[in-house]
Amino acid sequence: MYAVLVTGGKQYRVVQGETLRVEKLDVETGGDVTFNSVLLMGGSDGIHVGEALKDASVTAKVVAHGRARKVRIIKFRRRKHHMKHQGHRQYYTEIQITGISGPAKQ
C-alpha cells in the first residue's frame, strides 16, 4: 500500500518502512507524527483519490533533524567591481513511515 501526503507545501509518495527528508517539523527526535492530509491511497483494493481523504492518515517516527548542503548565492553587477556572496542551509527532518491507514470501506 502506498499514499501521497502533503507536508511543508510539498507532496510525497510514501510506502511503509520508507525513510525520507521533509521540511522541518517541530517534533523531538524519536517522537511520532501523524499526517492527516492524504491526497491519494493505492493498494490491492484499488485507488482512493480525493482532495483530502477522510479517515486516512500516515504515521511516522522522527529519526533525525539536520541541515541540508549549503546553497551558494552570488550577486554580481557587471562593470561595477561589485560582488555579493551569500549562503543558505535549509533545515529538514528525517522521518521513517511506520503505518498507513486507509479510509473506511464503502
From Swiss-Prot:
Gene Ontology molecular function, alphabetical: rRNA binding; structural constituent of ribosome
GO cellular component: cytoplasm; ribonucleoprotein complex; ribosome
GO biological process entries: translation
InterPro entries according to UniProt: bL21-like, bL21-like_sf, Ribosomal_bL21, Ribosomal_bL21_CS
Keyword terms, alphabetized: Ribonucleoprotein, Ribosomal protein, RNA-binding, rRNA-binding
Entries under Pfam families matching the protein: Ribosomal_L21p
Oligomer and partners: Part of the 50S ribosomal subunit. Contacts protein L20.
HAMAP family: Ribosomal_bL21
Protein name: Large ribosomal subunit protein bL21
Organism from which the protein derives: Xylella fastidiosa (strain Temecula1 / ATCC 700964)
Gene of this entry: rplU
